[in-house]
């Protein structure tokens, strides 16, 4: 079941990103800005004139993304191909990378929370979208902010559920339920984070 849901959701995300990217190419919206020297991690907003905190925030984002990528490869490679759980070195790498991701995610939450709050205009835009009303917005950050908060929210159950599995007070059935929570919230975290970074990269080259 989890294998099928993972394949389906990753396929939908990939197709959605591809269609969205191609539609932007048709409108000429994905060309990099001219006369601008792009840093090798410039896609995350890195600039030489940033302060120390600004550079740390962007480095934390890169570290969080890379660590989540490592955890995704170790976790989903076996499940997607042979529907098997992690064992051996894959499990060790997954567990060893998790603290790096958590520390980076907490730092991102603390430092980006204020900038990612929804403005009055963005709240009105969100309500309009929920009511299926057409809204014309230019350079809206609504999707970027929503995916940021969604990823941060899913980080909590994804982390706590796997820690709780280590305690026997939940019983066998409870531990199986917690593993399921960890798997599905982890999948949601990967999907939201991937889409969030795609939106950031696309906005940078828009």
Language model feature labels by segment:
Residues 1-206:
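Membrane-embedded alpha-helical bundles that constitute the cytochrome b-like, heme-associated redox core
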